[in-house]
Amino acid sequence: MITMMYKTVSLLACLLVIGMASCRNFDAKEVKIDSDLTLSGGETEWKKGFELSPLDSTKLSEVIRMYDLGNPDQVITLDKKLKEISGLSFDQKNNQILANNDEDGVIYYLDMEGRIVKEENFGKDGDYEGVERVGDNIVVGRSNGNLYFYDETSAETVKVKTDLKKDNDVEGLALDQQQNLLLLACKGAALSEKKSKREKFIYAYNLKLEVLHEEPFLVMPDAVHLSYVEYHIDDISQKEKEDLQKRVKSFAPSGIAINPINKDLYILSARGSFAVVYSANHDFQDVLFFDEKFLPQPEGICFSRGGDLYVSTEGGKSDGKIVKYSRR
């Protein structure tokens, strides 16, 4: 095992992953970056580090072709109650959209056209940032890491404190059904002070064990996203490329969702209006840039059962909106 400084690891990893993706003899599973910023061999579980692999050009094409981000299929103007919309998720049980804003302790049930069909009060006002269905419970995440389990049958709410705090700044919540985990995307610091500020983190709450795993579920290095823009986005001017890199540098997770079609993980950023995409195996896939005209401050993201993409944006001086991109 060879210990290296973070900058050196990031640079070498990105050159290998991004710049040399076409090298057939390079086996990505032999190189990983773990929580101690070391290079080592062999496979590893997700809790022990973030594994990089060469970008698969076919996979990238699939992601790019799946949605036409420049031409949304529908722009839905929301009720004024959702001007500050934050969390967004698809409710498979009722074929509805669940939403919350970042001020009120209210769960909003929307039809697929964005109309409010029901409201449920689950708690006091607070900075709420994500919503997901887990069985008969609707779970709402708060920026300080607390989870609120609202039982639809009894109309009672149970508050669960995790090890995440205000400094971690939880902004996104998603359900990983296959692993029975709630994923919490953090805009702020890592649980461990040893983690670099040039990375963002997702942590996992185990629903069966009722515990938050200390090691990150996913580590997202800024260097990987920047290298993608540098080496894999062509046919634009240098000024346009620099503008995209500036947007990527502002990466601040604001929402998270799993695509039901290929299980890719989409992590939304309100700053810069884009999303980064990682595979179910935690391999980086893509950066998707939204048109800021439609999504000036994207805060919530979800997918329908058929894979249509829905992204919400706060209203600012106007009303909140949900933008739909149909799966092609």
Predicted segment positions?
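C-terminal motif of bacterial Sec signal peptides marking the signal peptidase cleavage site
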Residues: 19-22
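Sequence/structural signature of beta-propeller domains
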Residues: 24-328
